[in-house]
Amino acid sequence: MNETMKAEIESQDDELFDLTPSYLKKEIMVLACGNILFADDGFSVHVIEKLNKILTDKEKQKIALVDAGAGAPQQVLTLIDENSKTKKIIVVDVIDWGIKPGEIKIIEKDELPNPKYHRLDSHDWPLAPLLREVAEKYNIEVKVVGCQAKYISEPDVYIGLSEEVEKAVDKAVEIILRELRGD
């Protein structure tokens, strides 16, 4: 067996045993954090579903749309390492900043809140420190598209968005599309 054949076989073996999630093999990740079972907490799921319908197949080759649910954003972010292709992460979530329900707030990496004073999401999980760490450690651009929730039913199940948050879905999609397409 010549060297060229050996190299080709080794390359195929590397691909067979590559356990890197597909979303870490793309340049841009849109990370939805939320749960449709808890009213406005489902905001990000509606946004990601609309983006999935609007983005072209060509765009999806470099953009990963990740519905991480309410509990998995931390797990997704902890899988990022120096081998990840990710250069930009856009997090979509409801926020609790005491602004008008349905209002969209764009949060840049440097504006990520100190969880002692503001919660990035409406849960008690401090996502902001992990986002900041990933951004700085791996030189990844991070933005959060947050929507002020009106009502989160957790722990009770309520499927559906409040009128204010439902109206904000299209606005968030427009903002994200401009960010993705450079418009």
Curated annotation (Swiss-Prot):
Molecular function GO labels: aspartic-type endopeptidase activity; endopeptidase activity; enzyme activator activity
Q: Which InterPro entries match?
A: Pept_A31_F420-red_hyd_d, Pept_HybD-like_dom_sf, Peptidase_A31
Q: Which organism is it from?
A: Methanocaldococcus jannaschii (strain ATCC 43067 / DSM 2661 / JAL-1 / JCM 10045 / NBRC 100440) (Methanococcus jannaschii)
Cite the Gene3D superfamilies for this sequence.
HybD-like
State what protein this is by name: Coenzyme F420 hydrogenase subunit delta
Q: What's the family?
A: Belongs to the peptidase A31 family.
The record lists the lineage as: Archaea, Methanobacteriati, Methanobacteriota, Methanomada group, Methanococci
Which Pfam families does the record associate with it?
HycI
Enumerate the UniProt keywords alphabetically.
Aspartyl protease, Hydrolase, Protease
